[in-house]
Amino acid sequence: MRDLVDTTEMYLRTIYELEEEGIPPLRARIAERLDQSGPTVSQTVARMERDELLTVEKDRSLKLSAQGRALATAVMRKHRLAERLLTDVIGLPWEKVHDEACRWEHVMGDEVEVQLVKVLSEYATSPFGNPIPGLDELMEGIPDSERAELQQKIDNLQVVTSQRASDIEPPEPIQVKILSINEIIQVEHKLMAKFHALGMRPGSVVDLVATEDGLEFSNDNGAMVVPEELGHAVRVEKVN
């Protein structure tokens, strides 16, 4: 039973991730992300459709139902709160945080979520700059003095003008501010370790340039290249 629930939650979170990245949530993409066979994904999606968690559209994309979206939001919220705890409190290395949070998201209780927002100094975004969704459901556990500030942070996240780094691909170096690093890059341990070692984190200003190998990010500490196929997963803002 636990494996069944975990599989459903993993699929829901993966669909949520794909939507965030601007990628159509197709069964083929889920198979790639979760390293599962096409028939396995099709069977699981069919079951989730019977459970009214999603529908398969005419273009074969997957559309979450209201119930499915609520569950996906809850799983992602737990995942990113866990990432905050693992990074800010426990001090786990960046390259290990995502995998560990994937375990915690399935076992974290609602009361723990409420306690985390009381303990954490930052809980509007994950340590990788991604918005933590569904925080309004935890508002009762947030001190009155902090509610207005949190709501302002949430509102600000919605109006930030961000672009996918792959949509810029500048032929000459330009300065950008890193805003977020999506989950698909977080599973690339060497890239995450490099981001951390070079001090390239959300809020950092770096130079960005397109190269033959991908997108090069550089600062005074050094340079790293993100492969072209992953460039969409780093969101940035141009610095005037």
Swiss-Prot record:
GO cellular component terms given for this protein: cytoplasm
Per its record, what are the GO molecular function terms?
DNA binding; DNA-binding transcription factor activity; protein dimerization activity; transition metal ion binding
**Quaternary state and partners of this protein?**
Homodimer.
> What is this protein's function?
Iron-binding repressor of the dipheteria toxin gene expression. May serve as a global regulator of gene expression.
What gene makes this protein? dtxR
S-S pairs: none
- Leader sequence residues: none
Q: Where in the cell is it found?
A: Cytoplasm
What's in the keyword line of the UniProt record? Cytoplasm, DNA-binding, Iron, Repressor, Transcription, Transcription regulation
What protein is this chain from?
A: Diphtheria toxin repressor
Q: Name one GO biological process term.
A: negative regulation of DNA-templated transcription
Query: Where does it mainly reside?
Result: cytoplasm
What PROSITE patterns would the database entry show? HTH_DTXR (PS50944)
User: What residues does the HTH dtxR-type domain cover?
Assistant: 1-65
Entry annotated with the keyword Lyase: no
SMART domains given in the database record: HTH_DTXR (SM00529)
Q: Does the keyword Transcription regulation apply?
A: yes
Q: Which family does it belong to?
A: Belongs to the DtxR/MntR family.
Which InterPro entries would you find in this protein's record? DtxR/IdeR_SH3, DtxR_MntR_Metal-Reg, Fe_dep_repressor, Fe_dep_repressor_sf, FeoA_core_dom, HTH_DTXR, Iron_dep_repressor, Transcriptional_repressor_C
